[in-house]
């Protein structure tokens, strides 16, 4: 696992520094670092009720195995909480390592080595090359620099469907009149 940001503990220090001073570390902040943007959410989980393949259940069970409360397996609107979520994320990292995986922080993929139309390596931080024929990218939506490199290399990308919501606020009197008529 190559993570452009820092581990969750050091990332928290960078985020707190930003909140206190306004000084942004562009590689370790609310968007980038171990756990992604969700690490600084309030830990509400999307249950994906229409998840016919059961992937969400697997994710929730994995969270429970790493310290999340069992209630998230059956609650309608499961919630972990920010502080506990950070511990869960760190626990998952340690399991990856215990199973022989390598997790590297401050390891930004800055280029892709392509030979004869095939991936042969990744360039990390503009200097180190890691030989590989396969890479699974999970850059999140804020890694525009990564998307630019993919585009510059003419590597195929497929957009993910998304939905945008909005909130409209109305005066209470207007809502009451709409719901209950003139007698409201």
Short names for language-model regions:
Residues 1-40, 44, 48-61, 66-184:
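Residues forming the flavin
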């Amino acid at each position: 696992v190559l993570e452009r940001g820092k581990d969750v503990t050091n990332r928290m220090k960078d985020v707190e520094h930003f909140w206190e001073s306004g000084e942004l570390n562009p590689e370790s902040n609310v968007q980038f670092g171990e756990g992604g943007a969700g690490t600084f959410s309030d830990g509400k989980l999307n249950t994906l009720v229409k998840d016919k393949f059961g992937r969400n259940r697997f994710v929730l069970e994995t969270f429970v195995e790493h310290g999340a409360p069992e209630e998230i397996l059956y609650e309608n609107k499961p919630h972990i909480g920010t502080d506990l979520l950070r511990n869960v994320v760190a626990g998952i990292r340690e399991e990856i390592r215990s199973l022989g995986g390598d997790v590297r922080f401050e390891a930004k993929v800055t280029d892709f080595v392509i030979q004869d139309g095939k991936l042969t390596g990744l360039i990390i931080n503009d200097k180190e090359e890691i030989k590989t024929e396969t890479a699974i990218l999970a850059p999140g939506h804020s890694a525009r620099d990564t998307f630019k490199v993919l585009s510059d290399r003419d590597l195929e990308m497929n957009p993910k469907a998304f939905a945008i919501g909005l909130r409209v606020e109305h005066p209470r009197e207007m809502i009451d009149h709409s719901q209950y008529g003139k007698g409201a």
